């Protein structure tokens, strides 16, 4: 998907992680600043939305700024590199990306806050669609433990996935 649809050659670690997310339910990536973690997450989100239908992709991070100004802007950048047919299928809003003709398929941004961990409750996948519920966690080291505990309940759906990236602390 990344090489064909986005016309990019991933770094070795990104390629390995892309293969891992296709075959494993959970992956975590720890690395320093500026190595392409947010680009990687953008690729994963677009891949899930366009290849797993229906698909729900709740995305969280330690701050609204990280979600809106970093992850969402990176997603928009990479979406512009998709073939025109795929681009036309995506609707971008400030905190949500939807597929035009499949209302059950979306990615949504929810800030991870200790005082409102329930923001990640209520998501359910489709058991016969691998990856139909996929949690994306940006800057995972800054996300409070209670948020992970709340999200864990939804991960009982067969085929659900979790992708976490962050800097080691």
Predicted regions and their residues:
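Phosphate/NTP-binding elements of NTP-utilizing enzymes
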Residues: 1-169
